[in-house]
Amino acid sequence: FFDFDEWALVLGVLGDKDAEGIIDALAPVVTRVFTTQPESPRASDAEALADLVELRGLVVSAHPASDDAMDTARRWAAEGDRRAVLIAGSVVLAGEAIAYAESEGWKA
């Protein structure tokens, strides 16, 4: 069980997945969304994902490069107490996040 007051979401989805379903499932628990495009030819466009998120009334910004999305989300989390970042939408993005976190020396 995690006890954070605010959650940000880094979201990158492959085009054949249910992006709207993922957004609808996570929207009630996130404060901010950073959309991105995983390194895959099947990746959904970060701007198109941001448009879907915006329709749900959430604060969102698009970051085509996943490392930029993760850095921006991490800075957002550091600006307040009890903030956390969730990375979701694609196993490809999860792999990129693990590799990037290791290269940056981030703790889990």
Residue map of PLM features:
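Active-site-adjacent alpha-helix immediately C-terminal to a catalytic or transition-state-stabilizing loop
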Residues: 95-108
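Active-site-proximal loop/hinge segments that shape catalytic or ion-binding/gating pockets
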Residues: 90
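Short helix-capping segments at alpha-helix termini
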Residues: 2-6, 54-58, 105-106
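Generic beta-sheet signal
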Residues: 7-9, 83-87
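C-terminal helical cap/extension that packs against the catalytic core
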Residues: 20-84
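Alpha-helix N-cap/loop-to-helix initiation residues
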Residues: 15-19, 42, 94
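Nucleotide phosphate-binding/pyrophosphate-handling subdomain across enzymes
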Residues: 1-32
